[in-house]
């Protein structure tokens, strides 16, 4: 039987608080050709994460699909262990496009450092192995398992978390509030080749719906 309970609850919420809050994710993108230092700024009520994507400068060139490291090559042989690795499920063919091939622009001695308003995040310069560990911890439910070699050659994406764990599930704005003082970010690397850098600032925004269909967006 149809009721108007939901409408009553909505009206009571608007009457008590003044508006109905509808949180949603918002993303801001920054692109540059990176050699050693790239700068950006973020102004948001809740800056949750920073996603860093490294690609070769010729990533837009059309070419054949690229085999993922460790999986079967053109001759049908796996490139890690005989029979494939059960942990990484490499006993099959797997391909990605050149556009979505994210490659570590450095070597094993390369260090990565993020500064937000002159504060280091984390407090030391990371290697690519440490970046993989940090990225897995920055996502509440990591699903993909990969080797360090696959990470550096095919899926090199770094994620810096600024929000509390499980805040996405509860839709809580627990990230950095950078509205009064805009966050000035600097990404520094050592011993890297020139690459195409794309930054995604993941933020929690809020749509406020008031009486009389009045709306407001809090970035």
Which residues does each PLM region occupy?
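Flexible assembly/topogenesis modules
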Residues: 1-219
């Amino acid at each position: 039987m149809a009721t108007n309970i939901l409408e009553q609850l909505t009206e009571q919420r608007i009457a008590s608080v003044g508006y109905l809050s509808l949180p949603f994710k918002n993303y801001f993108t920054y692109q540059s050709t990176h050699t050693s230092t790239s700068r950006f700024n973020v102004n948001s009520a809740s800056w949750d994460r920073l996603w860093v994507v490294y690609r070769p400068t010729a990533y837009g060139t059309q070419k054949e699909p690229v085999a993922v490291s460790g999986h079967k090559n053109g001759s049908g042989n796996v490139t890690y262990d005989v029979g494939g690795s059960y942990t990484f499920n490499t006993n099959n063919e797997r391909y990605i496009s050149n556009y979505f091939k994210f490659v570590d622009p450095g070597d094993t001695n390369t260090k990565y450092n993020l500064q937000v308003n002159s504060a280091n995040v984390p407090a030391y310069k990371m290697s690519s192995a440490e970046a993989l560990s940090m990225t897995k911890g920055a996502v509440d439910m990591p699903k993909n398992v990969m080797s360090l070699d696959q990470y550096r050659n095919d899926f090199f994406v770094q994620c810096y978390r600024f929000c509390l764990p499980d805040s996405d599930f509860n839709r809580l704005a627990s990230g950095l509030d950078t509205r009064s003082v805009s966050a000035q970010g600097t990404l520094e690397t050592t011993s890297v080749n020139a690459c195409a850098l794309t930054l995604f600032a993941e933020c929690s925004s809020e749509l406020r719906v008031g009486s009389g269909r009045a709306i407001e967006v809090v970035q």
